[in-house]
Amino acid sequence: MISGGPSSVYEAGSPTVDPALFSSGLAVLGICYGMHLMAQLSGGRVERGEQGEFGPALLEVDEPDVLFRDLESSQPIWMSHRDAVAVLPPGFRLLGHTETCPIAAMADERRRLYGVQFHPEVVHTRRGAEMLANFLFRICGCERDWDPRRRLGELEQQIRLAVGERNVLFFLSGGVDSTVAYTLTIRALGPERVHGVYVDTGLMREGETEFVAAVFGSIASGSFFIEPAAEEFLRALAGVRDPEHKRVIIGEKFVDIQERILERGHYLDGNWILGQGTIYPDTIESGGTAHADVIKTHHNRVAGIQRLIAARRIVEPLASFYKDEVRELGRELGLPETILSRHPFPGPALAIRCLCAEAAEPVRRVEDGWILPIRSVGVQGDSRSYRPVLALEQFPIEGEQLHDEATLLINRNAGINRVVSLVASHVPLPNVGSRPSEISPERLERLRRADAIVRRLAHESGFDRRIWQFPVVLIPVGDAARPDSVVLRPVDSVDGMTANAVLMERRLLDRMSAELLSLGGLCAVFYDLTHKPPATIEWE
């Protein structure tokens, strides 16, 4: 398989393959950029599309083929591209198209060469797994022998080999990934050789530290402790507004504290290494695979951590797994659902949900709505974008129309990567603007209280059990008396690589908004309508 990626086949230094691959007799599937490369090297033509496709689309299967065997002729798929195949290579035939992409799937069955413009590997291509299965088992002749649950014994052996006679110190967050990695390492080495530390950064949600202490106190049998470091993190983040800079600072501060703990605890005798709950999407989004674009630097993928990896002083037992697979491993380990069903929470915590602004700036009127004077991180064409946010004044009723409209607006406006809708406000949208702001104890507490309201109401209503994650984002947009606003960002996903924005029932939304607007300093409540891609789940 030749994967998608942020490059263009016309860029100098873009990834390529030996053209002899396509006459080797091996079955080849090109996905997105991989399809472009296959077409160009086989004598076709690739052009930059008139408009990109970022989000859901409908594939119309033009010709029956083994790749789409047992599937409907119309398929919901997921697009993230601008370049597209304009002319089929000799020997290829058209398999499918979308409304804006005339060549969305192609094949040369004689040479077993297949190309798809969409992404079958993401869960939002509804039957993408079956397409991949058709390629693997019907075209390539592979056998089914992968089951993450059956890998526990193998993973334990890998941990023992990686660690050797040394011991392991874990930094723990209380999330699913670090909990499963920690528990798995204890099972492989025994509790006396695995210690856990939770760094209280001062950036956590309400009640988070108490929850983590209870969870790991029961798992760790006395080898778990909490390191207070709130003042250090807040000092390091003072005046920092760039989201990538925030992530790097937090990651480096974690490394500094790790070194301090190692020295203080006499862990520097060479017998201790660092353990982490890094999973595969962390590596991809940090540009950690050969040709991946940096979308966001994950806090456990900064330079300091990379140096530890190079020095062979780190073990990451889950680095090849996705979130859904990690949960399956956790169940096999006997961890309770109260831990495994927790929504994902970013390592940098509330720091990347507390957006900052350099200067005062009003909202700007455009044809489709209002441009908010802030920017958010997105992923478009498999690469990172950092662009303004479009706000709509009305909150539509029909969920599907709402999400479809957001996708169309982004595809039509190259300068944005996210669409929000105003739910409730103390002042009209044209009267709000940004204020100079940074991460401060006051703003963090405002966000903490807002997040607690949202989590409580989502749990009481059962809404949190119907979604993957519910970020609550504080943005420095408001008026002089109420300088901040809140963005609600509920999404549904399986592995975090793609996500659908989810609409909640209006009665719950109204109740949530009323409680949020009763908090001091909050001006408005917005609702994020954007899928991933083109937006990332987190705003930073």
Predicted regions and their residues:
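A conserved amphipathic helix/loop scaffold
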Residues: 78-80, 86-97, 328-329
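Proline-centered loop/turn at the N-terminus of a beta-strand
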Residues: 25-29, 76, 93, 112, ...
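A glycine-centered loop/beta-turn motif at secondary-structure junctions
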Residues: 88-91, 97-141
